[in-house]
Design a protein with these regions (language model features):
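Secondary-structure transition/turn motif
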Residues: 58-63, 118-122, 130, 142-147
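Acyl-donor binding region in acyl/amide transferases
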Residues: 49-101, 106-111
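Conserved catalytic-core motifs of GNAT/GCN5-like acyltransferases
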Residues: 101-135
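A conserved beta-strand-loop-helix scaffold within acyl/acetyltransferase catalytic domains
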Residues: 19-51, 129-134
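Short amphipathic alpha-helix that is part of the acyltransferase structural core
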Residues: 1-24, 141-146
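Short, flexible beta-strand-to-coil junctions
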Residues: 38-39, 49, 88-89, 146-147
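Short beta-strand micro-motifs in enzyme catalytic cores
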Residues: 33, 52-54, 111-115, 137-143
Length: 147
């Protein structure tokens, strides 16, 4: 999602928008590299310890651009999976936004679900709950997908 008009914003402006949207204070994640482009926003990336996955952490600005950026970056490193944490309230809308369809819904003991999804290219994704927030209406999810 692009915040407002497509225009150049400073990193501080993107951070302010990130904090307003997430209601969390931005703090650079240790071990992650921050990438920033004035017309696209910012994104933090790092590999897992075994280099099997490229992780996208905090991000603001054009999400589809940063997904594509991370995909190319991972391909350069020979990595075949991407991962992130979704803090959006509507996980099914999030899955659709990225072009996936749920193929399987696995119920968990706490009433939440693990979602398995696939896009038009046959690439698979797994979306699993990681944290149920205090108000119980919001769940954060680990999202991993093949590239």
């Amino acid at each position: 999602m692009v915040y407002g008009d497509i225009m150049n914003n400073t990193l501080d402006e993107y951070i302010k928008k990130y904090e307003q949207k997430t209601k969390d204070k931005f703090k650079p994640k240790e071990g992650f590299k921050l990438f920033y482009l004035p017309s696209r926003g910012f994104c933090e990336l790092s590999t897992t310890k075994d280099n099997s996955m490229l992780m996208i952490y905090q991000m603001a600005g054009d999400g589809k651009f940063w997904r594509d950026f991370a995909t190319v970056f991972a391909q350069m490193l020979g990595i075949k999976k991407l991962g992130t944490i979704c803090i959006r309230e509507n996980i099914k809308a999030y899955i659709r936004f990225w072009g996936y369809k749920v193929t399987k819904k696995e119920p968990l003991h706490d009433g939440s679900f693990i979602y398995y999804a696939e896009n038009k290219e046959g690439k698979k994704a797994r979306i699993s709950p990681v944290h149920i927030h205090d108000d119980i209406t919001r769940i954060s999810y680990y999202v991993t997908w093949d590239i």
